[in-house]
Amino acid sequence: NGTGKSTILSNIVDSFYEMAQKHFMNATTPMESGGHNFFKTILPDEIHSGTSYMYSFLLYNCKESPDEEPPIYLCKSGNVTINDIKEQNNINISSISGDVQGNEKVLKASSKQVETIWKENVICYFGPDRYEQPVWLGDSYYIALDYLHPKVEDRFNGRLENSIAVHNVTNLNLQWLLDVIADSRGDIIGESDSLSLAHVSTANLLLMRQARENLEKILSIIIGKDVYFHLNFRSLYGSRFHIVQRENDDIICPTLDSLSTGQIALFNMFATIIHYADNNDITKSILLNEITGIVVIDEIELHLHSKLQKEVLPKLIAMFPKIQFIITSHSPLFLLGMRETLGEDAFDVYEMPKGQKINVECFSEFLRAYNYIKQTQKFNSDIQELARTIPTEGKPLI
């Protein structure tokens, strides 16, 4: 805590908002005096003691517009100029320059470039304040809208459909799940004691079914049981949406928000990635390995017990090989699980505040957790039991 992990992420997310507002009119909130409110304000108080300035510089690698200079984000404060920053970091980019000290924020990207980036990628942020309303919480203590019907909203050019920061999306994802389930079901007609599909292409129906199965696979990994989504009859009391075990058709959960806090948080996180990709291109919900983008997650282990951290999270991340995940974590179990599932070369670990690249077992939280375990009675009794098995005569086997 306090080493700057969230500060780094806040600059990345701020660049998302600054980039998005170049094209989308609803990406940021307007100011009465003109311009827009910053997602991240520039606070000189954040300058470290003993230094006179701070800055953040981000250069994106943009395959969507190879003929244009990639998007550039720079935020600075204190006794430093843009030209100073360029010189310190050997940055040879002509589109940004300046000799003025003090607070300044710059984002270089064209409207067309931004439109293409958001159209072809998932860009989102799951902050530490992400929250899912518990099923037991009274409505008067939590303001939320219920969207439990197939989506009928229009899309408007110039408006951002996928919110950058993701908060309490259970109902929104449930509405979308109803759309996915509806698309995966065909009209059935009876003819001469037989049933057949009508008004739909079998090939298209199978593709839509795959989108549904991708979401069912995510939930199956989280729950640890093979489950599917079931729609109850409209005449029956209670939720129409059930989570059912495939093996015996037993209802595991009567509705999505009956999952545990950790389970629903995980499902919403990865379902939202598919939801956003689906909004851009419906085929992306079918082919998860083709979803591209950047997903930023602060404190990914939030609400998750040890098994979800070590075994489940890495499996879910592995389902999206073309997504760049930028994650902060205090959990050594999560990193061990990532190494076991994806291999050492599939991800990089940087320890703050110096930004040093380290291997998993050099992570300070791992060493600290190990030291805590050594102090337990269970650890000491296991060591003593092991010591009793060592022969007292002859050469020890090393």
Model segments located where?
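Sequence-level motif detector for i,i+2 pairs with an aromatic at +2
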Residues: 120-123, 238, 393
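Switch/communication elements of ASCE P-loop NTPase nucleotide-binding domains
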Residues: 1-33, 236-385
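Short secondary-structure boundary/capping segments
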Residues: 114-115, 286, 388-389
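Short glycine/proline-rich turn/loop motifs
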Residues: 177-202, 246-253, 294
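P-loop NTPase switch/coupling surface
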Residues: 1-188, 204-213, 217-228, 232, ...
